Amino acid sequence: MASKKGNRIIIKLRSTESAHTYTTTKNRKNDPNRLELRRYDPTLRRHVIYRETK
């Protein structure tokens, strides 16, 4: 028997200024839209905006 899908899914966050990617989870129920977070980019050595990709 298959288990039901939970509300948490794994997503990728890609930097808007470089090719760096973070992996995180989000709750489908609380955040139905695409995430946009300000995170540290080690390639640029500063904080930039990361957007959720498919």
Curated annotation (Swiss-Prot):
GO molecular function terms noted in the UniProt entry: structural constituent of ribosome
Domain of life: Bacteria
UniProt-listed InterPro entries: Ribosomal_bL33, Ribosomal_bL33_sf, Ribosomal_zn-bd
Disulfide bonds: none
Keyword Ribonucleoprotein: yes
Pfam families referenced in this protein's UniProt entry, alphabetically: Ribosomal_L33 (PF00471)
GO CC aspect terms: cytoplasm; ribonucleoprotein complex; ribosome
Alphabetic keyword roster: Ribonucleoprotein, Ribosomal protein
Biological process according to GO: translation
Gene3D superfamilies named among the record's database cross-references: Ribosomal protein L33
Family under the similarity heading: Belongs to the bacterial ribosomal protein bL33 family.
HAMAP family listed in its UniProt record: Ribosomal_bL33 (MF_00294)
The protein, known as: Large ribosomal subunit protein bL33
Organism annotation: Roseiflexus sp. (strain RS-1)
Gene: rpmG
